[in-house]
UniProtKB/Swiss-Prot annotation:
Cytoplasmic topological segments: 1-58
GO-annotated biological processes: membrane organization; phosphatidylcholine acyl-chain remodeling; platelet activating factor biosynthetic process
Swiss-Prot/TrEMBL domain comment: The HXXXXD motif is essential for acyltransferase activity.
Organism: Rattus norvegicus (Rat)
Database matches in CDD domains: EFh (cd00051), LPLAT_LPCAT1-like (cd07991)
Function text: Exhibits both acyltransferase and acetyltransferase activities. Activity is calcium-dependent. Catalyzes the conversion of lysophosphatidylcholine (1-acyl-sn-glycero-3-phosphocholine or LPC) into phosphatidylcholine (1,2-diacyl-sn-glycero-3-phosphocholine or PC). Catalyzes the conversion 1-acyl-sn-glycerol-3-phosphate (lysophosphatidic acid or LPA) into 1,2-diacyl-sn-glycerol-3-phosphate (phosphatidic acid or PA) by incorporating an acyl moiety at the sn-2 position of the glycerol backbone.
Coiled coil spans: none
Encoding gene per record: Lpcat2
Intervals of motif HXXXXD motif: 146-151
Motif extent (EGTC motif): 220-223
Protein name stated in the entry: Lysophosphatidylcholine acyltransferase 2
Residues in compartment: Lumenal: 80-544
Length: 544
């Protein structure tokens, strides 16, 4: 981090902006719009405040309703179990063929009735909007937002389609048998081929022409607080068949159903819900959405379009959070940071910065070692004094100006990850190192003198009075630098790649700036590195 601080600071300093001798300038590349903070910072938290009057009401109602409803739910489950046995007896746990027609005709009507009876006994008042599509019209239902275990009511209303569920759930006594009666697609956490097998199974059933039951999928993959729609996983959209979006709403004054990573437990929510006079839920079946030819070839595009339609109907925003953000939240809590510190919008960060979960998790460890002692789990310039980043200095302030994307005086984990990837990302292949060496070797004698190094670096950064002698002395073993010395230093310290290749990378402003805000890059001193070489070195870059 210290070397990154030096590298970032060198790239950020220009004269005359009022910070020390050299001052501060805005980052060389303007902020990328797609990296702006999400409209909903944390969709995985729920804080329900219950007034004293409401508590008293719940206690009085609960004295009667809680035991009665618990008894009724238990009774319904016991009544449903024999039908589940008839539906699954002598059938393998992982079905290769659909349940026979005679089993369906005996069990399905009874299970549908008992499913509705169970939610009625729990106090749910269900409103259904729209028309349920037939298996031929839409083999797959996609349900959102997914916010609670009570969302199973969508399965009952849709006519008991198959679910995608963990293999362990099918092993649970009583409930496991009921789940198997729905002919679920089971996912194994220990099988390395589980994801591929699950997708193939969904594809096979979706394209069976109605032979299998419809499949109901919660594409978000985890529960949220219904304040937004997070990233849809592409599994339900890979078959390229029409899907029917299903919206869930819980329009109650007191929210007793939301089950998130930070909030009430399963038992607490059951007790709170059972103590309500009734709980309203709306299930809306939207028009069937058929994929275009382009969307058949790109399930992520199909998922994105369907998500946007559902968000528009719900009048809520979309974010790029996903289940991996939940894993990072848990990791942050284990590192004594606030759980929300781990939220980064994993889908967006991993896609745009080419980072996988392990890489971001490693950055979280680094971040925690700096921020664990800071208030609120955020890095501040003053709180970092004497720590790993170093004392508060002009260099540190310059680094903060680059990392602090929202200019609030502190760096959260999301800003930290983006800053490291953008500013300190190693970019030193041997070809780039060779071009960089030629850039500095003005007289083409195979060595870089201090004068050559300073002249080109100052010109390429647009900072004519920048002092880079210290950096030169760190590279050089004498009065000049050979190619082998230059290469050795660049490979050992990849964080300086941004400095060595600034001349070749000025076009990155097109990648990280808003289209209307793209500014003309400062002119730089030319040497014998030809324009053709420059184009070759940059033509592979992809503009966002």
């Amino acid at each position: 981090m210290n070397r990154c601080a030096e590298a970032a600071a060198v790239a950020a300093t220009v004269p005359g902006s009022g910070v020390g001798d050299s001052g501060l300038r805005p980052p060389m590349v303007p902020r990328q719009a797609s990296f702006f903070p999400p409209p909903v910072p944390n969709p995985f938290v729920q804080q329900t405040r219950i007034s004293a009057a409401r508590r008293l009401q719940m206690i009085l109602l609960g004295i009667i309703l809680l035991p009665v409803r618990a008894l009724l739910v238990g009774l319904v489950l016991l009544l449903a179990w024999p039908f589940a046995v008839i539906s699954t007896v002598c059938c393998p746990k992982k079905l290769t063929h659909p349940i026979s027609d005679w089993r369906r005709k005996i069990t399905q009507p009874a299970l549908k009735f008992l499913g509705r009876a169970m939610f009625f006994s729990m106090g749910f008042r269900v409103t259904v909007k729209g028309k349920v599509a037939s298996p031929l019209e839409a083999p797959i239902f996609v349900v959102a937002p997914h916010s609670t275990f009570f969302d199973g009511i969508a399965c009952v209303v849709a006519g008991l389609p198959s679910l995608v569920s963990r293999n362990e759930n099918a092993q649970t006594p009583l409930v496991g048998r009921l789940l198997r009666a729905l002919q679920p697609v089971l996912v194994s956490r220990v099988d390395p081929d589980s994801r591929k097998n699950t997708i193939n199974e969904i594809k096979k059933r979706a394209m069976s022409g109605g032979e299998w039951p419809q499949i109901l999928v919660f594409p978000e993959g985890t529960c949220t607080n219904r304040s937004c729609l997070i990233t849809f996983k592409p599994g339900a959209f890979i078959p390229g068949v029409p899907v029917q979006p299903v919206l869930l709403r819980y329009p109650n004054k007191l929210d007793t159903v939301t089950w998130t990573w930070q909030g009430y437990t399963f038992i607490q929510l059951c007790v709170l819900t059972f103590c309500q006079l009734f709980t309203k839920v709306e299930v809306e079946f939207m028009p069937v959405q058929a994929p275009s030819e382009e969307e058949r070839n790109d399930p992520v595009l199909f998922a994105s379009r369907v998500r946007n339609l559902m968000a528009e109907a719900l009048e809520i925003p979309v974010t790029d959070h996903t289940y991996e953000d939940c894993r990072l939240m848990i990791s942050a809590g284990q590192l004594t940071l606030p759980m929300e510190a781990g939220l980064v919008e994993f889908t967006k960060i991993s896609r745009k910065l080419k980072l996988d979960w392990d890489g971001i998790r490693k950055h979280l460890d680094e971040y925690a070692s700096i921020a664990s002692s800071a208030k609120g789990g955020r890095i501040g310039a003053s709180s970092a004094k004497g720590g790993r980043i170093g004392p508060v200095s002009d260099v540190l302030r310059q680094l903060f100006a680059l990392f602090d994307r929202n200019n609030d005086g502190s760096i959260d984990f999301r800003e930290y990850v983006i800053g490291l990837a953008v500013l300190c990302n190693p970019a030193n292949t041997e070809d780039i190192i060779q071009v960089a060496f030629k850039l500095f070797d003005v007289d083409e004698d195979g060595y870089i003198t201090e004068e050559e190094f300073c002249t080109i670096l100052q010109a390429s950064l647009g900072v004519p009075d920048l002092n880079v002698s210290g950096l030169f002395r760190e590279i050089a073993q004498g009065d000049s630098v050979s190619y082998e010395e230059f290469k050795s230093f660049a490979l050992k310290h990849p964080e300086y790649a941004k400095i060595f290749t600034t001349y070749l990378d000025l076009q990155t402003c097109h990648v990280f700036s808003l289209p209307e805000d793209v500014q003309t890059a400062p002119s730089v001193a030319s040497n014998k590195v030809s324009p053709e070489s420059h184009e070759e070195g940059t033509s592979g870059k992809k503009v966002d």
